[in-house]
A protein has these predicted regions:
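N-terminal Sec-pathway targeting helices
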Residues: 2-20
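Histidine-centered active-site loop/cap adjacent to the catalytic His
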Residues: 13, 24, 29, 262, ...
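Membrane-interface motif at the C-terminal end of an N-terminal transmembrane signal
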Residues: 22-38
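Generic structural signal for small/hydrophobic residues in well-ordered secondary structure
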Residues: 26, 112, 157, 173, ...
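Membrane/wall-proximal cationic-aromatic binding patches
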Residues: 37-132, 136-139, 339-354, 395
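Conserved SGNH/GDSL esterase-like catalytic core that processes O-acyl groups on lipids
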Residues: 77-84, 100-101, 106-108, 114-209, ...
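Second-shell loop/turn segments in exported
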Residues: 113-119, 146-147, 255-259, 308-311, ...
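Serine-dependent acyl-ester chemistry module
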Residues: 178-323, 330, 335-345, 386-391, ...
């Protein structure tokens, strides 16, 4: 009997010990760790914009990707910066009308976390591009709305573009791609030349899943927040970064099949822009180790622990993209020579909260350099492009 009576006491003691341990860990995390959530995908972003909404079910365009905002404008924090979102789900305080204002040139950007920005609002690529183009515009007003989100890929951009250009009046579309954006992704196109959105229904997120009650606690707990974001970071690396790195270390041949899968999407993009009389440009952001040997060593030692293949370092993926763009009738801007010419390449990239130089996300200077190159291209007449291969949106 005495033994049975001791179990409640033991359980109470164990519970008290666990609670004390949790509280001590919570205090330690708050004192010694800077918990600054970083968005890894649009589900993460949605949770911060409007936690009560679910962007798997509802967003401005009714698509399986994108944002839903329940208020006209919302704010969230991302890698230390306040991010404001308009009613369209863009990281932008301006609520753009679908119709373009008079005497205005509107350049729409599509991209992932690089376009979304790891910098202050005024330092982002859309803002820098607007300033750079206004210097060349002879008084014409410039608008640069941008649909962007951490975790998006080339398929995401095309889905958003199909809907966006049917609603927004635009003059130019710039699609900014990173090497991992086109690794293994193929745009599904129907027989009538449209993107098959229904086939892209979102799969359940494999990152840390919490009940509503635990989420309510986690929202106020630095410890649980840190654990949740560590889980998301691990999953994001396993799902997207490591497969891309495997190709980067194997050589150019590892990208060939993936680049070939883009052809249908590139053809669809070229035809859509041509039919709507929109100028379209694909722009590729390089990985830092491609730019300079000394910087490559610094980045690789900090992040990867492995060396990129010579083909990748020598711009093999970018050359493959340029060839595909020419084949399908798209303008293409390779930022590798732009960044090399800018010099001091380490300053082109964002410094992470952990004190490491990012290998792809741009600093304020990086965005300014990119914007100047892009504005120069867009201010010049379109380059002559082949048209024979762009008659259909289907592959």
């Amino acid at each position: 009997m005495a033994e049975s009576n001791s179990w409640p006491k033991r359980l109470a003691l164990l519970s008290a010990s666990m609670l004390v341990s949790f509280l001590m860990a919570e205090v330690a995390v708050r004192l010694f760790t800077k918990v600054d959530p970083r968005f890894y995908n649009d589900a993460d972003t949605q949770q911060h914009i409007s936690p009560e909404s679910d962007n798997r079910k509802d967003n401005p365009f009714g698509l399986p990707m994108g944002f839903h905002t329940t208020r006209t404008s919302t704010e969230a924090k991302h890698v230390g910066f306040v991010t404001r979102f308009n009613r369209h789900g863009m990281r932008d305080p301006v609520d753009y009308d679908f119709a373009k204002p008079a005497d205005t040139r509107r350049v729409m950007l599509l991209g992932d976390s690089v376009v979304f920005g790891h910098v202050e609002e005024s330092q982002r690529l859309p803002a820098a591009l607007r300033r750079a183009m206004e210097k060349r515009s002879d008084g014409q007003k410039i608008e640069t709305p941008a649909f962007s989100c951490p975790g998006w890929d080339f398929v995401s951009y095309m889905v958003l573009m199909q809907e966006a250009v049917s609603k927004f009046e635009v003059d130019d579309v710039v699609v900014g791609v990173v090497l991992n954006d086109f690794t293994g992704y193929e745009v599904p196109i129907t027989e009538d030349g449209k993107i098959d959105v229904a086939s892209l229904a979102r799969q359940p997120d494999s990152t840390l899943s919490l009940t509503s009650a635990v989420k309510a606690v986690a929202r106020h707990s630095a410890l649980l927040t840190a654990l949740a974001w560590a889980s998301k970071g691990f999953y994001a690396r396993k799902r997207t970064l490591e497969p891309t790195l495997a190709k980067l270390t194997k050589g150019q041949h590892a990208f060939d099949a993936d680049v070939a899968k883009l052809e249908g999407g590139f053809r669809w993009l070229a035809k859509t822009c041509r039919d709507r009389k929109i100028r379209c440009l694909v722009m590729s952001f390089p990985y830092g180790p491609q730019l300079e040997e000394a910087f490559a060593r610094q980045v690789i030692e900090s992040w990867f622990g492995k060396t990129f293949s010579p083909e990748v370092v020598n711009d093999g993926p970018q050359r493959a993209l340029a060839a595909l763009a020419a084949k399908t009738g798209l303008e293409y801007l390779d930022l590798v020579p732009v960044y090399r010419q800018a010099g001091d390449v380490a300053t082109l990239f964002f410094d992470t909260p952990e004190g490491r130089i990012d290998y792809v996300h741009l600093s304020a200077r990086g965005n300014e350099v990119t914007a100047e190159a892009l504005a120069a291209r867009l201010s010049a007449p379109p380059q002559p492009l082949p048209t024979a291969a762009t008659d259909t949106g289907a592959p």
